[in-house]
Amino acid sequence: MSDVTVANYHAFPDARGHFGRYGGRFVAETLIGPLQELAQAYDAARHDPDFIAAYNKDLKDYVGRPSPIYHAERLSRKVGGAQILLKREDLNHTGAHKINNTIGQALLAARMGKTRIIAETGAGQHGVASATVAARLGLECVVYMGATDIERQQINVYRMKLLGATVVPVTSGSATLKDALNEAMRDWVTHVGHTFYIIGTVAGPDPYPRMVRDFNAIVGREARAQMIEDYGRLPDAMTACVGGGSNAIGLFHAFLNDASVRIYGAEAAGDGIATGRHAASIVAGRPGVLHGNRTYVVCDDDGQILETHSVSAGLDYPGVGPEHAFLADSGRVQYVGIRDEEALAAFHLLAHTEGILAALESSHAVAHAMTLARDLPKDALVLCNLSGRGDKDVHTIAAREGVRV
């Protein structure tokens, strides 16, 4: 990691969509025009009081915001050390943080006169959230999903279909999130005249990383105000899972300039970094270009993207949002790898102590929150983003543990 001195983390990206040496637009010439059109439309919308009012109204009345911060008292006692607090994004409509972003992008699509939206999805939560807002706004919806992920997330596939979306299986490559994103990009190039591509994470070419961040930043703004109101201070540490990194940057962004708050991103270490079967782009990757932006990627010595592994479909991605790459280089956020078995243990412990089934993605963050808590005094506060609920993962966990359901 290089040494980067930053006075104000909220000053990024720059006018060209760069977070330091990361980000940008590394795309075919055919996409430059559509991306410029999208950037102009988004910049106009985010300064339009009517658009912001409509977005905030939907967050309140449709999504059900604000989401609460819950003190996991029994989990904290079981783990020992600091108090673990959960930002309950799992309580949002559709069961995850993804709806914060899809509401914003769908409203922008309608504002631009687009009649069709497309999306990629891994765990299925972004696909469900995209299908949900498409149904609400009367837009056609097509979701690209890797065939491997379809097998392990059949409940969410059926939810998308119930909502009126067409789910397109992607069989190329490893048939996971990376490949679904590739196919969605190809669709967008072909049908850009009437199609809006709702990217589900803070990756992709500019303006997507900043746009998805901005629509998810409500998580951190709420959490900051809630911490001050309920506890009279900011947390000592916070953590969130990181695949592409949208839930994490949504929580982190409001706290980046608060030097007293230690921030951690929990990547998927899969079977262990040393095995090569992981999806830890920052912990075990290197800078490269993927899906239109420069960032950290999981690749070989020649720069070729490698297949990744995680028990969690939503973290099974060989890249990470460029802002996370920048935050890693600056040292503001520390990124750690959480193995499958650690995430599964955290899933079970949270269920047994608090009656909460967390998504496998979120369980990576819960696992690291537990590690942080053990090394801190009892009066310290650790905030963990519970980015989604785990109903979708019950069959995956049961199959892994030899239970027939």
Swiss-Prot record:
Catalytic activity entry: (1S,2R)-1-C-(indol-3-yl)glycerol 3-phosphate + L-serine = D-glyceraldehyde 3-phosphate + L-tryptophan + H2O
Signal peptide bounds: none
Gene Ontology CC entries for this record: cytoplasm
Source organism superkingdom: Bacteria
Residues modified to N6-(pyridoxal phosphate)lysine: K98
Gene Ontology terms for molecular function: tryptophan synthase activity
Pfam families, alphabetized: PALP (PF00291)
Database matches in CDD domains: Trp-synth_B
Keyword Lyase: yes
Keywords assigned: Amino-acid biosynthesis, Aromatic amino acid biosynthesis, Lyase, Pyridoxal phosphate, Tryptophan biosynthesis
Pathway named in the protein's UniProt entry: Amino-acid biosynthesis; L-tryptophan biosynthesis; L-tryptophan from chorismate: step 5/5
Gene3D superfamilies named in the record: 3.40.50.1100
Complexes and interactors: Tetramer of two alpha and two beta chains.
Family indicated by similarity: Belongs to the TrpB family.
Function field: The beta subunit is responsible for the synthesis of L-tryptophan from indole and L-serine.
HAMAP family membership: Trp_synth_beta
Protein name, UniProt field: Tryptophan synthase beta chain
Native source species: Xylella fastidiosa (strain 9a5c)
